[in-house]
């Protein structure tokens, strides 16, 4: 898997894939820049009249439900239909689906139009989408929705069943990340609490996933993205003195990651 991760980064930088992102204004700037740091080329078009055309030229589509608006709720289905019709891989970030009925129902609508190759969300969001009780605190996962040794097997069973039913891959984020498909799973313990002290790191992780989806399979894309971004966060914390310098350092550390860092 480590060899796959380093190869994913190499392939991405060689291909420079165009990634069409429809996301929220809170983190859009950072999302575009992290795609560049990963080796992709972002385009953030979201007008309903142009999104289908833009998606048709992209190598991957990233949809993020944060700060959802009527305009993006009109645009996302159009892009998703286009992606599905011409086999462009899709990452859907389920931001807020555990705390907002509007977003929960809209996510279900999107998944019925065309199932994204990768669904990303925190534990509360993925539990909610799986029909389980969730305890979200706003868009954050609730403390009751935490992966532990006691519930690990039970949660894995739930998510593998859903991955098989939906024919997709799940990235469930938290202190310990889970990447789950119908027939395999992995757990990733990387990153730092400092990453939760700036806005948009979850959105950025989704964009890295989408960028890697353009060159590799969903499982490898998710594992590579979560591992590399977590390592970058750990290195950034060592070289920063607070949230401001940490944010700048996070981009630099992610951009400059080497094969030795990942190993």
Tell what function each PLM region has.
Residues 158-163, 218-233, 250-251:
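Short, well-structured alpha-helical segments that form the helix of a local strand-helix-strand
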Residues 188-199:
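Short pre-catalytic strand/loop immediately N-terminal to key active-site residues, enriched for Gly-Thr
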Residues 2-92:
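Conserved N-terminal subdomain of the carbohydrate kinase-like
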Residues 230-263:
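Charged C-terminal helix
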Residues 68-71, 96-100, 178, 195:
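Short, small-residue-enriched loops and turns at beta-alpha junctions
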